Amino acid sequence: MMSKYVTTTKGLSHFMLFLLRLLALALFIYSVSLVFTSNFNMGNLLVWLLTAAVDVYAIWQQPIHHWLHGTIPGKIVFVFLLVFGILYAALLGFVAFSGYANPATGQEKVVIVLGAGLRKDRPSLLLRYRLDKAYEYAVAHPDALVITTGGQGRDEWVPEGQAMRNYLIEKGLDSQRVLAECKSTSTEENFLFAKEILVQQGISAQEPVVYVTNAFHCYRGGVYAAMAGFTTAHALPAGIPLRSVLTCYLREAAAVIYYWLFKSSRTGFMQPLVGLLSLNKKFFYK
């Protein structure tokens, strides 16, 4: 048995093993930091699961390597993980590049800013990236109306839409130009309820609009805008903090899969689970 272990571990050089353990340590430190720097969400959960898998493999590499390559069940699992990893990586690439596939034209007179979570009553760093991008557009287009969207999460002191509106006004936008939507709990509802506000303002959903979100989120933003009835919606992608790249892209890829399966964030197997666990819906697909 020992000879098998010695033989199978030769496939993983000392240098590669060092890199694996370095990656495991980095993921562990990053995972711990999320507890103190981010609200609990699906992205964090996926990172923790990834960290657990990498750390377990780094610690028990010998027996796991032997099982994956030396047994039939292990080989089946290995092939499954390999195919899954390749497909998920391809999906991550799709999410990354789709953010720039439908850019704003500069002719849009309505700006819809999608919510992204608060820290108490202030926009999170990720959300500030969106708001700053929306502010730049609003300053360059003084006749554009801005709608901030987002309801109040379980760990938030005020509705996102209100906190976002306050942020833009503090930066210098005229309060008459900024309207807050404060009921939505998902990207889909952001657009549905923003449309209601526009109708109240006498603006048709046929008018060109630009929605502001981070680049990774633009694909779903576009499809949900179309589902809500916006016929000409363009994306204005904002940047993303380096510390949020892994959590956001892992979560968004899962959210895209969910959309492809169920189309609507108001249906599907997640919906009763959300109610059962008393979790804000943004945990799964904000």
Set out the residue ranges of the language-model regions.
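Extended hydrophobic blocks
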Residues: 1-108, 199-286
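A structural signal for short, hydrophobic/glycine-enriched beta-strand patches
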Residues: 78, 90-250
